[in-house]
Design a protein with these regions (language model features):
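Conserved small-residue
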Residues: 146-225, 475, 666, 683-774, ...
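Extracytoplasmic gating/loop element in the C-terminal half of outer-membrane beta-barrel translocons
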Residues: 220-223, 494, 533, 800-891, ...
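Extracellular/periplasmic, surface-exposed regions of secreted and cell-surface proteins
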Residues: 37-39, 83-84, 280, 286-295, ...
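Short acidic/polar hinge/loop motifs at secondary-structure boundaries
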Residues: 47, 90-119
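Periplasmic N-terminal soluble interaction domains immediately after the signal peptide in Gram-negative
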Residues: 1-10, 102, 112, 116, ...
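Short, polar/charged loop or turn motifs at beta-strand boundaries
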Residues: 28-51, 59-63, 71-78, 92-97, ...
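Residues embedded in well-ordered regular secondary structure
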Residues: 22, 28-31, 35-42, 52-55, ...
Length: 936
C-alpha cells in the first residue's frame, strides 16, 4: 500500500520472467514495500500481507508461531482443487513454507491478480501470484553492514471469553439440578433439598472447604460465611510469558562489475501457550557478476533450519491445549489442595503436586496438561535450501537470453512423544516421521526490445520451462514406553503403525509474450502458455492458456493538456485471459487400489475408477481498471472491476450402485467471483520537517455458483445451489426463549406458514433458511505514516465489514443442559428464570438437552472487525551524533503487532477461515518489542 511515491515511469514492478515499468503494465498488480514486511512481527510473510493490497485476503487461522496464513486473491476459484496462490521467489516458483523466509531479506512483494499479469505462469497461477523479491547488493557501492535486533513479549491478541466465577457456577449448578428434580416429579421443596445435598457430589469437589459441606442453601444462595479457598486460572497455567527475539545481520555492496548481499538471521518466537513456539536460523547469499559486457552470471543461495513446538490444537480433542485451558473452571485446582484449608499439598521434595482431578465430572477427569505437556514432545523440525543460478547473455542491443536453474529442498522431521507417567491412562508412545520434497526448475527465456521511429516500442519474449517435483515420506509409531525421559521409538515395546509413500509431478511448458506501445499512450500485450502436466491422461495432458490486455494513458493525449496542471496521470486498463488449474492430485486420472488384510492374508482392491477424460480446471479472468494521480502525485488511486469465472471444476459424480463405486470425479462445476477494488493514497502534508502519508484499500466481491453436479449439495452448514454462493449459511432459525417456561424455540414451516416449536428433533432440512454469508461484504486495510524530523509513527490497520461467523467455540460455553464441570460463559447469569422471562438464554436443566446448543442461527456472529495490525514508533538519531562513531544510521524503535482488536463478540478472534467456522483454534498473538537498527 503506497509502497512508492515515484512517477509511473520510474516504478519498476516484478512480472513473470522479468520486470516492467508500471506505466507500460497492462495487468493488475499490487506492491508492498519491504519496509512494511520487516515492520511486522510474525514468523511467516503470509501473515504480514493482510490489509496491504486490495483483492488479497490473508486469514491467520492459527496464531501458532511458524504457521503460514491462508491467502486468497480475488476469492476462491475452485471447490476441490487447490485455492492457494503461486509463490515466486526471485523469479522462480517456490515450493517451501513462507515461514522459512527471513522478512528482513525481502525487498518487495508484488501481487499479480489478473490474467494479463499472471498467465505466463500458466496452470500454477490459477489462483494468482505472489512474487517475493529479495534484497540485492548495489554495483559500485562500498560495503554496507546493517544490524537489526528486536526483543519483546507476546500474549493473546484477544482475551478469552469471560467465564462464570466459582460462586455463580455453583449457584447455577444447583439451579440446574433443582429444575431436573422438578421435571422428574419432585416438589419444589424436595427438589431444592436434593440439589443442595448433591451439588458438591455432582462437581466432584468442594472449593468452600469441609466446613461447608453444602455451600448452596435451599434458596440457591451461598450459605452464610462460605467463600472459596482457591480460585485457579487454567488459562494462566496453560500460557507462558512468551518472549520474542529477532536478530539479523546483513552485508551488501559491489564493485563496477559485481554486487553481493549476504545475511544471517535468528528468530525465537515463543507461543502464548506452554510448549509452543518457533525458532528459525537463516542464511542467504545473493551474488551477481558481469563477467563480460555481454555476459552476466548470478547465484542466490538460501538455507534455513527451524524448530516448531506444536502442541495439539485446532480440534475437539481433550488434549487440545486451547480447549483444555478454556474448559476447566477455576474451582478445579491446578495443584492439589487441602480440602479443609485450601493450602497447597507438597510431595517429599517440597514441590507442589499437580492435581489430575480423577474426581472431576466430564471428559477431563484424570488430565492435567499443565504438567503432562512438560514431559511430552511435539516437534516439527524443518530444513530448507534454495539454490538458484542463472546465466544472462546479451548478444546484441535489445536481445537477451537467460537460463535459470533452481532447486528447492525441504525436509520436515516430526517427532511426537507422550510420556508414560503423567496423564490420563498413560502408556506412552513415540512417533517419528519424515517428509522430504525436492522441486527442480530450469527455464530458458529470450527477450527482445526495440524502439522504431521513436514512437513504436515492442517487447517480445519466448521461453521454455521444465519443472519436476518429488516427495517421499515415512512415519512410524510405537507405544508402551518402558523408560520415561528417553524419547526414541525403540524405548516402546508395541508397534502401532508404520508406512510411507512417494509421489512425483512433472510439468513441461512453452510460453511467449508480445507487448507494443505507441507514443507512450497506447499499450497492448498478449501472452500464450502451453503446459503439459503429468497429472492428466496423455490425451488431455496439454492445456493452452492465454491473455491479452491493453491500456490507454489518457493523460498523454493532447486534449488533456489543460488538465495536466493538476492531473498527473489518468490511465484506463483492461485485460482478459484464461488460466488453468492442474492441482487436483498427483494421479487424478488413474485408477487407484488399496492394500488391506483379510484372514491373515494381504488383499488388493480397487478404491477409485480411472478417469481418463479428466482435464484442467479453467479460470476466465476479466479486469478493467483506472489509475489516476493528481496534485503533483500527492493523491493517487486505482479503481478496478474484476470477474473470475471458473469452469470444468472437479466434483464427484454419482454412479449407479451396480458399478461397485458410489461416485467418480468429473469436470462438471462452474463458479464466478466478481467485484470491485479501490486503492487511494495521499500525502496531505509534505514540508521540510513534516510528512504525513495515508493509504486505504477496499475490496468487495460476490461469489456465485453457476453449475453443480446436482441441484443441491450440502457442505456442513452451507447449502450449495445454482445462483447461490459457496458461503451461504442455511440453518434452523432461532426463535428465542419461550417466556412461559424458559425452553428454547426454533421456527419451522407448515404448508408455508411460519410457526414455532420447542422440539428440535422435529425439524427437517426444509425448515432451514438462508441465514447470511461467511463472506465479508468489504475487506481491506489502511495505513498512516507521520514523520517529524527524525521521529516517525507508522500504523497499519486491517478490517472487514459484514459477513458472519459460526461460533462453535461458544456453543460449549453456553450449554444449559447441565454444566457438567466445564467452564461456562458469564452470559448464563442472564438465563431464564420465573423472575427473568425476557431473555435469550434458556433455563438451566441438569439433564441431556443437547438441542439447547444445536445448530441454528443463534450461533452466528457478525465477523466485522478492525485490527491494528502493526504500529511502529521510530527515532532516527541525528547524523551529527553518529559521525564521530563512523556510523551511517542508527534507528531505535518500538513495534507492536495486533495491538488492538475491535469486534462484535468478546473473546472471539475475528480472523477466522473464509468458510466462517470457528473451532478451538490457536488465537492470534499480540507482540510488543523494542529494537535497534544500525548501519555501518
Amino acid at each position: 500500500m503506497g509502497a512508492d511515491e515515484r512517477s509511473l515511469e520510474e516504478i519498476v514492478i516484478s512480472v513473470p520472467y522479468g520486470t516492467r515499468k508500471k506505466a507500460s503494465f497492462t495487468g493488475s498488480a499490487g506492491i508492498v514495500g519491504g519496509e512494511k514486511i520487516s515492520s511486522s512481527q510474525v514468523s511467516s510473510v503470509s501473515k504480514a500481507l493482510q490489509g496491504t493490497v486490495a483483492g488479497l485476503q490473508s486469514f491467520s487461522t492459527s496464531g501458532q508461531p511458524g504457521e503460514d496464513a491462508n491467502v486468497y486473491i480475488r476469492g476462491v476459484g475452485s471447490v476441490n482443487a487447490s485455492t492457494t496462490p503461486l509463490y515466486v521467489v526471485d523469479g522462480i516458483p517456490y515450493d517451501g513454507k513462507l515461514a522459512n523466509i527471513n522478512s528482513q531479506d525481502i525487498a518487495s512483494v508484488t501481487v499479480l491478480k489478473d490474467a494479463a499479469a499472471a498467465s505466463l505462469y500458466g496452470s500454477r497461477a490459477a489462483n494468482g501470484v505472489i512474487m517475493i523479491t529479495t534484497k540485492q547488493g548495489q554495483a559500485g557501492a562500498a560495503p554496507s553492514i546493517e544490524l537489526t535486533a528486536k526483543y519483546g513479549f507476546s500474549s493473546r491478541a484477544v482475551a478469552d471469553y469471560d467465564q462464570l466465577s466459582t460462586d455463580d457456577y455453583f449457584k447455577l449448578q444447583w439451579e440446574g439440578m433443582r429444575n431436573r428434580y422438578i421435571n422428574n416429579g419432585k416438589t419444589e421443596a424436595e427438589a431444592a433439598t436434593l440439589a443442595s445435598a448433591n451439588t458438591v457430589k455432582a462437581l466432584g469437589i468442594n472449593p468452600y472447604g469441609t466446613a461447608y459441606p453444602q455451600p448452596i442453601d435451599q434458596n440457591g444462595n451461598l450459605v452464610a460465611g462460605a467463600h472459596t479457598l482457591w480460585d485457579d486460572s487454567w488459562e494462566d497455567a496453560m500460557t507462558q510469558n512468551a518472549h520474542y527475539t529477532d536478530l539479523s545481520a546483513r552485508v551488501s555492496g559491489g564493485s563496477k562489475t559485481s554486487k553481493y548481499y549476504i545475511s544471517l538471521g535468528y528468530l525465537d518466537d515463543q507461543g502464548a501457550y506452554i510448549c509452543s513456539g518457533f525458532k528459525r536460523y537463516n542464511v542467504r547469499t545473493n551474488l551477481t557478476s558481469d563477467l563480460k559486457s555481454w555476459l552476466q552470471v548470478g547465484m542466490n543461495l538460501s538455507a534455513s533450519h527451524s524448530i516448531q513446538s506444536y502442541p495439539k490444537q485446532n480440534d475437539t480433542r481433550t488434549d487440545n491445549v486451547v480447549l483444555f485451558a478454556r474448559q476447566l473452571p477455576s474451582f478445579y485446582p491446578v495443584y492439589e489442595r487441602d480440602p479443609e484449608t485450601g493450602a497447597y499439598l507438597y510431595d517429599n521434595n517440597g514441590n507442589k503436586i499437580y492435581d489430575y482431578g480423577n474426581y472431576r465430572s466430564g471428559s477431563y477427569a484424570g488430565m492435567n496438561l499443565a504438567q503432562s505437556m512438560l514431559y511430552d514432545k511435539h516437534d516439527r523440525k524443518r530444513d530448507a535450501v534454495t539454490a538458484q543460478g542463472f546465466v544472462l547473455v546479451k548478444p546484441m542491443e535489445g536481445l537477451t537470453y537467460k537460463m535459470t536453474m533452481n532447486l528447492d529442498y525441504n525436509s520436515l522431521f516430526t517427532h511426537d512423544y507422550t510420556n508414560p507417567t503423567y496423564g490420563k491412562r498413560p502408556i506412552g508412545s513415540s512417533a517419528k516421521g519424515n517428509t522430504r520434497t525436492t522441486g527442480f526448475t530450469i527455464n530458458n527465456v529470450v527477450n527482445y526490445q526495440h524502439t522504431f521511429a521513436e514512437k513504436h516500442d515492442i517487447t517480445l519474449m519466448a521461453g521454455q520451462e521444465y519443472y519436476e517435483y518429488n516427495t517421499s515420506n515415512f512415519s512410524g509409531e510405537r507405544s508402551n514406553v518402558i523408560a520415561d525421559g528417553y524419547y526414541e521409538p525403540d524405548v516402546a515395546s508395541t508397534l502401532v503403525d508404520f508406512g510411507g509413500n512417494a509421489d512425483q509431478y512433472k510439468l513441461l511448458s512453452f510460453f511467449g509474450n508480445a507487448e507494443y506501445s505507441y507514443m507512450k499512450k497506447y499499450y497492448a500485450s498478449v501472452s500464450l502458455r502451453s503446459d503439459g502436466s503429468s497429472r492428466f491422461h496423455p490425451d488431455h495432458r496439454w492445456g493452452t492458456f492465454w491473455s491479452f490486455g491493453g491500456s490507454w494513458r489518457i493523460i498523454n493525449e493532447k486534449f488533456m493538456e489543460p488538465a495536466t496542471k493538476w492531473l498527473n496521470n489518468l490511465t484506463l486498463r483492461a485485460s482478459y485471459g484464461a488460466q488453468g488449474n492442474d492441482n487436483v492430485g498427483y494421479y487424478a486420472y488413474q485408477a487407484l487400489y488399496s492394500i488391506g488384510k483379510f484372514d491373515g492374508e494381504a488383499t488388493l482392491h480397487a478404491s477409485r475408477l480411472a478417469t481418463p477424460n479428466l482435464t484442467w480446471e479453467t479460470n476466465l479472468n476479466t479486469n478493467i481498471g483506472v489509475d489516476f494521480s493528481m496534485f503533483g502525485d500527492r493523491l493517487t488511486g486505482t479503481v478496478e472491476y474484476f470477474e473470475r469465472a471458473s469452469k470444468d471444476l472437479l466434483f464427484s459424480r454419482s454412479l449407479v450402485p451396480s458399478s461397485g463405486f458410489s461416485s467418480i470425479d468429473d469436470n462438471i462445476g462452474k463458479l464466478k467471483n466478481y467485484g470491485w477494488e479501490f486503492t487511494l493514497s495521499g500525502t496531505p502534508i509534505h514540508t521540510k520537517d513534516w510528512m504525513w502519508k495515508l493509504s486505504v484499500n477496499a475490496t468487495t466481491y460476490k461469489n456465485e455458483i453457476v453449475q453443480l453436479p446436482t441441484e443441491v449439495m450440502w457442505s456442513g452448514s452451507k447449502k450449495w445451489v445454482k445462483g447461490g454462493s459457496l458461503y451461504d449459511y442455511y440453518l434452523y432459525e432461532w426463535a428465542g426463549v419461550n417466556p412461559d417456561n424458559g425452553n428454547p424455540q426454533w421456527y419451522y414451516y407448515d404448508n408455508g406458514e411460519k410457526k414455532v416449536t420447542e422440539d428440535y428433533s422435529s425439524l427437517t432440512s426444509d425448515d432451514k433458511v438462508k441465514s447470511g454469508s461467511s463472506l465479508p461484504d468489504v475487506t481491506g486495510g489502511f495505513s498512516t505514516d507521520i514523520s517529524w524530523k527524525g521521529l516517525t509513527l507508522s500504523a497499519l490497520f486491517s478490517y472487514a465489514i459484514g459477513g458472519k461467523l459460526y461460533n462453535n467455540d461458544y456453543t460449549d460455553l453456553m450449554g444449559v443442559g447441565g454444566l457438567n464441570g466445564s467452564s461456562k460463559s458469564v452470559e448464563l447469569i442472564n438465563r431464564w428464570t420465573p423472575e427473568n422471562r425476557n431473555t435469550n438464554v434458556p433455563k438451566i436443566v441438569d439433564q441431556q438437552t443437547s438441542y439447547f446448543t444445536s445448530s441454528s442461527t443463534r450461533w452466528l456472529v457478525d465477523r466485522s472487525y478492525l485490527r491494528l495490525k502493526t504500529v511502529t514508533l521510530n527515532y532516527s538519531l541525528p547524523h551529527s551524533l553518529l559521525q564521530p562513531l563512523t556510523l551511517k544510521d542508527v534507528n531505535v524503535f518500538i513495534q507492536a503487532e495486533n495491538l488492538l482488536t475491535f469486534s462484535h463478540q468478546q473473546g472471539l478472534d475475528p480472523e477466522q477461515p473464509l468458510n466462517g467456522t470457528v473451532s478451538y483454534r490457536y488465537p492470534a498473538m499480540k507482540t510488543i518489542s523494542f529494537g535497534i537498527n544500525v548501519k555501518l
